[in-house]
């Protein structure tokens, strides 16, 4: 069997062989090609210390395919001592468009990023350079929401090796449950990579559930000088019912009048202080404290440089994605530090850091223009239904981009033209049970979340969706969800589940329609109305013929329904807030794409 390791010194028969041999002779470094990469140094001659610490490696992307070490090494040598360079190679002898360079210390790596990013290596060819991070953390989706951290940790240790920790976040709606996913940290990148390979879809199930695994987004590192000026706190794990006034009162209790303003989004908030000392004091005093029945986590918000919007990642070069044209943001923003591992970055622009960019969106309901580029979604997006970047991590296939979909009234990144259409459920159609894991959700819909919240308020249990499919008259595969509500099903098993009268060509549309049909059947409006009780109550004999309501059911007012219906609309309203740009609308989903 042919080895991936080239014989000899790795230079025989290569392009620019003479120039490369001259480089090796001048520097004394080794140059060996193996496993699709050409390694220069690592360690360099005379190196008798330990390898450089984490943070000393940079990623260089957008390389001309016929550029090699004889041009790249002299450029990097001007900045600092090179410990190692790894140039990714194709079988045809060209490079793959990117390389990794490890310097002897962090400061040299930082200088290299500043000096080499957008450096014109050849006429009209600009390099893309950013920090490189060895990722040791995996995203695992498909975890039952009832499982606790200790159970997940124990289970992951059974099926993979090298597990160090598990990070689990509570549901925004129910703090006793998790969000349906977890982040598993391993002792090394190699251990994480081996675990990811072992956990490929279909190989292993957890608690009888199929799972999806992908690399987690690495935390954005901000230099100490920048962090030393931050006076905004990020507060997470709040109750949905916790108000901005309550948060402001709690943080002002440390020092009255210290808080300038508070902005709460779902279950997290940003607290602005007039000076940094007060912010740090409040963080130390309130981190871990129980507020409104939930222990909160308080950290400093992380300012992110504009270069964080254009990520160059390990993997096939040239697929990095950026916001262009009307959707560029030339100024610095602030980064939500925990959505690093929750799927969608949340940025905002406090006046202390930047002015508000001029935003323009289409005037009519529809798609964004192709100024905003996109890539194929990862399994995290399929499970969480929000875009997830994975920048600067090992082996992620160049998948860096800024998440900004979910803009309220139907704004999505432009893709294939899609026509919303429902199909009649005709006699003789055969409905076949299906599994949703292998199907890609198309967008975030609101009706399923409304139904879930109504069921929670009335103690009916979690709605159960069962996917079926049928072949239409035009030979298209059509989908239909049957919906079962546990409490009602136990009372009326003969007429359950709820079956909508139409099928859809899209899975997410079928789920939305099934939820809407269920709400309509229950007599619950999905849009606002006058004051009064519209949801089932204990004083109502039935919500519709044949369905009795449990006597312990709590009343749900129109105002509460309207609040549930407008969760997504509230997100869109943040575009008008003085310091929140539109792309902050992609706040995290509670589980698999539900807000």
Swiss-Prot record:
Alphabetized GO MF terms: enzyme-substrate adaptor activity; RNA binding; single-stranded RNA binding
GO CC, any one term: apolipoprotein B mRNA editing enzyme complex
Subcellular location per the Swiss-Prot or TrEMBL entry: Nucleus; Endoplasmic reticulum; Cytoplasm
Phenotype caused by lack of the gene: Mice display embryonic lethality at E3.5 due to failure of embryos to implant.
Entries under SUPFAM superfamilies matching the protein: dsRNA-binding domain-like (SSF54768), RNA-binding domain, RBD (SSF54928)
Matches recorded under SMART domains: RRM
Example GO BP: cytidine to uridine editing
Region (Required for nuclear localization) location: 360-409
Expression (tissue specificity): Expressed primarily in liver, small intestine and kidney.
Gene3D superfamilies in UniProt: 3.30.160.20, 3.30.70.330
Keyword Nucleus found: yes
Alphabetic keyword roster: Cytoplasm, Endoplasmic reticulum, mRNA processing, Nucleus, Repeat, RNA-binding
Location, primary (coarse class): nucleus
Domain RRM stretches: 56-134, 136-218, 231-303
Domain notes: The RRM domains are necessary but not sufficient for binding to APOB mRNA. Additional residues in the pre-RRM and C-terminal regions are required for RNA-binding and for complementing APOBEC1 activity.
Subunit structure: Part of the apolipoprotein B mRNA editing complex with APOBEC1. Interacts with TNPO2; TNPO2 may be responsible for transport of A1CF into the nucleus. Interacts with SYNCRIP. Interacts with CELF2/CUGBP2. Interacts with RBM47.
Function: Essential component of the apolipoprotein B mRNA editing enzyme complex which is responsible for the postranscriptional editing of a CAA codon for Gln to a UAA codon for stop in APOB mRNA. Binds to APOB mRNA and is probably responsible for docking the catalytic subunit, APOBEC1, to the mRNA to allow it to deaminate its target cytosine. The complex also seems to protect the edited APOB mRNA from nonsense-mediated decay.
Record-given protein name: APOBEC1 complementation factor
Organism, as annotated: Mus musculus (Mouse)
Name of the encoding gene: A1cf
């Amino acid at each position: 069997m042919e080895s991936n390791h080239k014989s000899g010194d790795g230079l025989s028969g290569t392009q620019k062989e003479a120039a490369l041999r001259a480089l090796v002779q001048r520097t004394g470094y080794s140059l060996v090609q193996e496993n699709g990469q050409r390694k220069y140094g690592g360690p360099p001659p005379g190196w008798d210390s330990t390898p450089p610490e984490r943070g000393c490696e940079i990623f260089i992307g957008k390389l001309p395919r016929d550029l090699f070490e004889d041009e790249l090494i002299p450029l990097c040598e001007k900045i600092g001592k090179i410990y190692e360079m790894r140039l990714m190679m194709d079988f045809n002898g060209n490079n793959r468009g990117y390389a990794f360079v490890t310097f002897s210390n962090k400061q040299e790596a930082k200088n290299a990023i500043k000096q080499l990013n957008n450096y014109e290596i050849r006429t009209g060819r600009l390099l893309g350079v950013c920090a490189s991070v060895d990722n040791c953390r995996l995203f695992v989706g498909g975890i039952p929401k009832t499982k606790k951290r200790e159970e997940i940790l124990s289970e992951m240790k059974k099926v993979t090796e090298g597990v160090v920790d598990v990070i689990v976040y509570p549901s925004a709606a129910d703090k006793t449950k998790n969000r349906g996913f977890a982040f598993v940290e391993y002792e090394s990148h190699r251990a994480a990579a081996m675990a990811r390979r072992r956990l490929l879809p279909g190989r292993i199930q957890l608690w009888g559930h199929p799972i999806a695994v992908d690399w987690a987004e690495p935390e954005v590192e901000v230099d100490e000088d920048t962090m030393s000026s931050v006076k905004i706190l990020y507060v997470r794990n709040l109750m949905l019912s916790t108000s901005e006034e309550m948060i402001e009162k709690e943080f002002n209790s440390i020092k009255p009048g210290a808080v300038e303003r508070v902005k709460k989004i779902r279950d997290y908030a940003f607290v602005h202080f007039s000076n940094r000392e007060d912010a740090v004091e409040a963080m130390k005093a309130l981190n871990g404290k129980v507020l409104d029945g939930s222990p909160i986590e308080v950290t400093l918000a992380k300012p992110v440089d504009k270069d964080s919007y254009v990520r160059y990642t390990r993997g096939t070069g040239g697929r990095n994605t950026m916001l262009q044209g009307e959707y560029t943001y030339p100024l610095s923003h602030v980064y939500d530090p925990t959505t690093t591992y929750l799927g969608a970055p949340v940025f905002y622009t406090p006046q202390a850091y930047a002015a508000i960019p001029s935003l323009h969106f289409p005037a009519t309901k529809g798609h964004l223009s192709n100024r905003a580029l996109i890539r194929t979604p990862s399994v995290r997006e399929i499970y969480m239904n929000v875009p997830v970047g994975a920048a600067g991590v090992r082996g992620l296939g160049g998948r860096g981009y800024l998440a900004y979909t979910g803009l309220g009234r139907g704004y999505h990144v432009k893709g294939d033209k899609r026509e919303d259409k429902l199909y009649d459920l005709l006699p003789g159609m055969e409905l076949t049970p299906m599994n949703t894991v292998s199907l890609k959700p198309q967008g975030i819909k609101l009706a399923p979340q409304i139904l879930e919240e109504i069921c929670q308020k009335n103690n009916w249990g979690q709605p159960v969706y069962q996917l079926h499919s049928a072949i239409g008259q035009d030979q298209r595969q059509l989908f239909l969800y049957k919906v079962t509500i546990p409490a009602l099903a136990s009372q009326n098993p003969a007429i359950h589940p709820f079956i909508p009268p139409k099928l859809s060509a899209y899975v997410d549309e079928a789920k939305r329609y099934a939820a809407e049909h269920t709400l309509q059947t229950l007599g619950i409006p999905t849009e606002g109305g006058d004051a009064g009780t519209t949801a089932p109550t204990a004083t109502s004999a039935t919500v519709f013929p044949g369905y009795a309501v449990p006597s312990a059911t709590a009343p749900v007012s129109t105002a509460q329904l309207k609040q549930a219906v407008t969760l997504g609309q509230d997100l869109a309203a943040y575009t008008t807030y003085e310091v929140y740009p539109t792309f902050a609308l992609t706040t995290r989903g509670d589980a698999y794409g539900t807000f």
